[in-house]
Structure formats: structure tokens, C-alpha cells
Curated annotation (Swiss-Prot):
<dbReference type="InterPro" id="IPR035246">
    <property type="entry name" value="Spermidine_synt_N"/>
</dbReference>
<protein>
    <recommendedName>
        <fullName>Polyamine aminopropyltransferase</fullName>
        <ecNumber>2.5.1.16</ecNumber>
    </recommendedName>
</protein>
<feature type="binding site">
    <location>
        <position position="106"/>
    </location>
    <ligand>
        <name>S-methyl-5'-thioadenosine</name>
    </ligand>
</feature>
<feature type="binding site">
    <location>
        <position position="31"/>
    </location>
    <ligand>
        <name>S-methyl-5'-thioadenosine</name>
    </ligand>
</feature>
<dbReference type="InterPro" id="IPR029063">
    <property type="entry name" value="SAM-dependent_MTases_sf"/>
</dbReference>
<comment type="subunit">
    <text>Homodimer or homotetramer.</text>
</comment>
<feature type="binding site">
    <location>
        <begin position="137"/>
        <end position="138"/>
    </location>
    <ligand>
        <name>S-methyl-5'-thioadenosine</name>
    </ligand>
</feature>
<dbReference type="InterPro" id="IPR001045">
    <property type="entry name" value="Spermi_synthase"/>
</dbReference>
<dbReference type="GO" id="GO:0008295">
    <property type="term" value="P:spermidine biosynthetic process"/>
</dbReference>
<keyword id="KW-0745">Spermidine biosynthesis</keyword>
<dbReference type="GO" id="GO:0005829">
    <property type="term" value="C:cytosol"/>
</dbReference>
<feature type="binding site">
    <location>
        <position position="86"/>
    </location>
    <ligand>
        <name>spermidine</name>
    </ligand>
</feature>
<comment type="pathway">
    <text>Amine and polyamine biosynthesis; spermidine biosynthesis; spermidine from putrescine: step 1/1.</text>
</comment>
<dbReference type="Pfam" id="PF17284">
    <property type="entry name" value="Spermine_synt_N"/>
</dbReference>
<dbReference type="GO" id="GO:0004766">
    <property type="term" value="F:spermidine synthase activity"/>
</dbReference>
<feature type="active site" description="Proton acceptor">
    <location>
        <position position="155"/>
    </location>
</feature>
<comment type="similarity">
    <text>Belongs to the spermidine/spermine synthase family.</text>
</comment>
Length: 286
């Protein structure tokens, strides 16, 4: 008998994956956690019924989350990751020797342990000596930060449940305060294709645009995300993601990537017309 996992995107749309085996199922204080083995995407991590990432496509998310701000900020030393318990973002950050401190704020200790067991390649990033994990609420952690970080990455992907506070006006304001005078914040902007997701994208962009002088959005193709399309937010106190992009400097690093390139960096900010329209409408609101 075939076993299938289905993630509901809308009442009329599902993402369905043939499943070879359920590797893990448990419930932490914060969420339901499941790991499935699939023929098409390898192991997938599911939180509260939603695919967080898969072996096959997580490199896209991690590379676009990290390399974009690292290729723009001229001298980053300290990075804060809100969420990130799987270690994927940390693993890419550790490729940069100039980083002196990488702080991970993840409330769910069980999630970290599950990822260490079933996704050891990603979780290896958590073992770098520059990485410190704080098992705390991200919003509460930020309230005690001021002028501390060069880059903040909000690695929470959905504005629901225990991560809802990471998509509020307070969170973006606290992130602004926690950044140094030339700091950059990267956040997950979601997928704008379906109506409910579009509403969340609008809300995020409006709040960030009010909190930061520079607010831009870039894109990537991630097959397991809704509609296979994902947006990232780039918010900055000083640097523009394209005008201040150090293309030649990044290329000289000769880092191995599977998705991100210097040319793609610029192209990722060239958005479809319907997405531009959504963002421009929200930028006009106060």
C-alpha cells in the first residue's frame, strides 16, 4: 500500500509526497515534530503538519538566507539567528572565517536533538565553537539587546503558533534596536501566490517598511514551499542589497554553493509584476 504525506496549502491545493517510512514522530512543548523518508526528496522535517525542509532542497533556503547579507555587509562579526534549531543556517554561516560570534535562539530543545539525529549534516553547524545556542523565546531575547549585532536572521518561517511573535511590529522594532548602526536583518517573507499567504506577506512588508529605512524583497525557487516559490526580506539601516553588493569580493571567496551565485544575487531582487504590486501597495500605507 502506498503511503502519502499531504500538506494543505489551501482548501483546494495540497503538496503530496510519497512516503517510504516514518522515521520519527513526537510532540515537544512547542510543536508536533515528524521526520519522514521520501523517495523524491529524501528525509523531510515536518512541524505541525507543514514541511519545514527536505534533504533535497534545503540548500536553497540556507544559501539565500546567509549569502545575500554576507555579500553586502562589509565587516560582519556578530550574527544572531532567531530559530535555526536545525542548524542549516548556522552551517552556512560557519563558512565565513571573519564571523566571531553566531548566536542561535531556539526555544525548542527537542527540535535541536531530533535534527542532530536525523539531519546531522545540517546540525553540524551547531557544533562550531563560535556558535552558542540559547533555548529561549526569540522576542524575549531581543528585548534585552541593543546595538549588538551586525546581522540578524529571523529563521522562523510561519507567523503562526509559538513563532507568531516573531512577525510583529514589536519584533521588527526590537530587531532594529538590536542591530548596530549599519546592521542588516533577513527574515522569511513567505510565498505570496495563494490568498492567505499573500495577506501574511503584505502584513510583514508593511511592518518592516515602517521600521527600517531600506526594505527590499528577494526570491528563490524552493520546490517544497507553497507554489514552489519563496520570498525573503532584506531590511537594513544603511546598505542597499544591490547597490552595496560586493560582487567581486564575494566571488574571490570561492565558496562552494549549489544555488547562490553573484549573478543570481542581483537577479533575485527582480520580482514578478504581481509581487511588485503587492509590495508597492503596502509601502504606500502608514
Amino acid at each position: 500500500m502506498d503511503l502519502w504525506f499531504s500538506e494543505v496549502h489551501t482548501p483546494d491545493v495540497k503538496l503530496s509526497l510519497r512516503t517510504a517510512k516514518q522515521l520519527y514522530a513526537g510532540k515537544s512543548e512547542w510543536q508536533d515534530i515528524e521526520v519522514l523518508d521520501t523517495p523524491a526528496f529524501g528525509k523531510i522535517l515536518i512541524l505541525n503538519g507543514h514541511v519545514l525542509f527536505s534533504d533535497a532542497d534545503d540548500f536553497v533556503y540556507n544559501e539565500m538566507t546567509v549569502h545575500v547579507p554576507m555579500a553586502v555587509h562589509p565587516n560582519p562579526k556578530k550574527v544572531l539567528v532567531i530559530g535555526g534549531g536545525d542548524g542549516g543556517v548556522a552551517q552556512v554561516l560557519t563558512l565565513y572565517p571573519e564571523l566571531e560570534q553566531i548566536d542561535i535562539v531556539e526555544p525548542d530543545e527537542m527540535l535541536v536533538e531530533v535534527c542532530r539525529e536525523y539531519f546531522p549534516d545540517f546540525a553540524a553547524g551547531l557544533d562550531d565553537p563560535r556558535v552558542t545556542i540559547y533555548y529561549q523565546n526569540g522576542l524575549r531575547f531581543l528585548r534585552n539587546c541593543e546595538d549588538d549585532y551586525d546581522i540578524i536572521i529571523n529563521d522562523a518561517t510561519d507567523p503562526f503558533g509559538h513563532t507568531e511573535g516573531l512577525f510583529t511590529k514589536e519584533f521588527y522594532g526590537n530587531s532594529y534596536r538590536a542591530l548596530k548602526e549599519d546592521g542588516i536583518m533577513i527574515y522569511q517573507h513567505g510565498s505570496p501566490f495563494f490568498d492567505e499567504d499573500e495577506s501574511a506577506c503584505r502584513s510583514m512588508h508593511r511592518k518592516v517598511n515602517q521600521a527600517f529605512p531600506i526594505s527590499r524583497v528577494y526570491q528563490a525557487h524552493i520546490p517544497t514551499s507553497p507554489a514552489g516559490y519563496w520570498l525573503f526580506g532584506f531590511a537594513s539601516k544603511k546598505y542597499h542589497p544591490v547597490k552595496d553588493f560586493d560582487k567581486e569580493g564575494w566571488k574571490k571567496r570561492q565558496l562552494f554553493t549549489e544555488y547562490y551565485t553573484a549573478n543570481l544575487h542581483v537577479g533575485a531582487f527582480m520580482l514578478p509584476k504581481y509581487v511588485e504590486d503587492i509590495l508597492e501597495e503596502e509601502e504606500g500605507k502608514k
